[in-house]
């Protein structure tokens, strides 16, 4: 993970009344954008552990182990970005999870899927703004882990649903096709712009912690 490069920093408030923190531009902006989302995910899984759903899981159950592993991964991602960004890092964010029922399995897993799918789409959409190869490489490594999280959560919710049209441009072979690649769809994960991502993410952040990515374009 060594060798990451940072360029530019802007964590000043912008003129958008619904956002309090702008992530910045260039590589620093992308890394702060990722740092913010990882903070949100890590905070979510920490809260999950305090709810009746998690507390009711058998200690050796696969479901509990999956949640524990994901929580550890997200914490590691947060600390990684905090270290890499140093003084360029945005502040610690305050989440707002009032709309989530942490005692209810279905609600927890639905929101876990929201966060994981959002994280994958965010990395895929922001990658084009990364200007240096080392930063692009580490983003690729982290998004691959986030995609594994998303697939696991989807499969817990509904078996064999880890790939679906809402997150992947599914490839459908053409009727009667005999050659590979003859059909519709790319088979690639879908992406979202930073602005699209923050429309969702800001719903889970308190006033004073909401984000803008006006300089990631």
Where are the language model's segments positioned?
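C-terminal motif of bacterial Sec signal peptides marking the signal peptidase cleavage site
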Residues: 4-8
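All-alpha RGS (Regulator of G-protein Signaling) helical domain and cognate RGS-like helical scaffolds
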Residues: 11-217
């Amino acid at each position: 993970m060594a060798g990451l490069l940072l360029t530019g920093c802007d964590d000043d408030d912008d003129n958008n009344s619904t956002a309090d923190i702008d992530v910045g531009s260039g590589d620093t902006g992308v890394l702060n954008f990722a740092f913010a989302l990882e903070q949100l995910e890590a905070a979510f899984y920490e809260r999950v552990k305090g709810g009746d759903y998690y507390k009711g899981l058998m200690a050796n159950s696969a479901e509990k182990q999956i949640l524990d592993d994901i929580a550890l991964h997200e914490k590691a991602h947060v600390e990684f970005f905090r270290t890499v960004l140093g003084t360029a890092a945005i502040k610690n964010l305050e989440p707002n999870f009032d709309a989530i029922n942490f005692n209810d399995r279905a609600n927890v897993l639905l929101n876990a899927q929201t966060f994981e799918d959002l994280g994958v789409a965010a990395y895929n959409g922001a990658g084009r703004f990364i200007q240096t190869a080392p930063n692009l490489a580490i983003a690729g490594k982290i998004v691959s882990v986030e995609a594994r999280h998303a697939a696991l959560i989807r499969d817990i919710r509904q078996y064999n649903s880890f790939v679906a049209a809402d997150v992947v441009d599914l490839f459908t072979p053409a009727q009667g096709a005999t050659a590979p690649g003859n059909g519709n769809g790319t088979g690639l994960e879908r992406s979202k712009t930073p602005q699209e991502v923050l429309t969702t993410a800001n719903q889970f952040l308190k006033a004073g912690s909401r984000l803008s990515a006006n300089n990631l374009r």
